[in-house]
Amino acid sequence: MPKVGLFNKEGQQVGDIQLNEQVFGVEVNKYALHQVVVAQLANKRQGTQSAKTRSEVRGGGIKPWRQKGTGRARQGSIRAPQWIKGGVVFAPKPRDYRMSIPKSMRKVAMTSALTSKVADMVVLEDLNFEAPKTKEAVKMLNAFEAKKTLIITAEVNENVYKSARNIEGVTVMPVNNINVYDLLNCKTLMITKEAVNKIEEVYA
């Protein structure tokens, strides 16, 4: 079973913690990771982009000048795509980008993402601030030399969230909001011991 250090928020190791092999020690499935990340990013898209084709732009029904004899290039409509204020060629229309992923694949992707982050994981014995204080959050991150950090707490923690929300490259979320994209996108995964236990309850 994978074993990692257990730290306090001052950066001092206070012990070790055994991680469940079914969650943090699986074979990384790159295909599942790719599928879930693509679906997650696709599902974030609004799909509301829209433009008009030449048939939808107002006007342009009459031929601007006769076909021959003017010395100018032949034109059929002032709303053709080559004209200013003309329609758009293959104009985008609103569409639904949603993708559905099987539950089993989502689980495989999540355990693969967690396994791939074990080497960059910092497990905290506890994480709480008496009051929202960005200075305290910066001090904690500096103690671990953390860059582009994802902080996962067991529950919604307002003090931790408010302390870290203004720090560039730091994301804070409760354990029930974790997702594959954010796990893969961080350089350092900072997670509380209680949050680890909750993850193992769900995915083991």
Swiss-Prot record:
Keywords: Ribonucleoprotein, Ribosomal protein, RNA-binding, rRNA-binding
Top-level taxon of the source organism: Bacteria
Pfam families in the record: Ribosomal_L4
InterPro entries, per database record: Ribosomal_uL4, Ribosomal_uL4-like, Ribosomal_uL4_dom_sf
GO biological process per UniProt: translation
One example GO MF annotation: rRNA binding
Keyword Magnesium found: no
GO cellular component, one term: ribosome
UniProt region (Disordered), positions on chain: 44-76
Assigned protein family: Belongs to the universal ribosomal protein uL4 family.
Subunit and interaction comment: Part of the 50S ribosomal subunit.
Task performed by this protein: One of the primary rRNA binding proteins, this protein initially binds near the 5'-end of the 23S rRNA. It is important during the early stages of 50S assembly. It makes multiple contacts with different domains of the 23S rRNA in the assembled 50S subunit and ribosome. Forms part of the polypeptide exit tunnel.
Protein name: Large ribosomal subunit protein uL4
Species: Clostridium perfringens (strain SM101 / Type A)
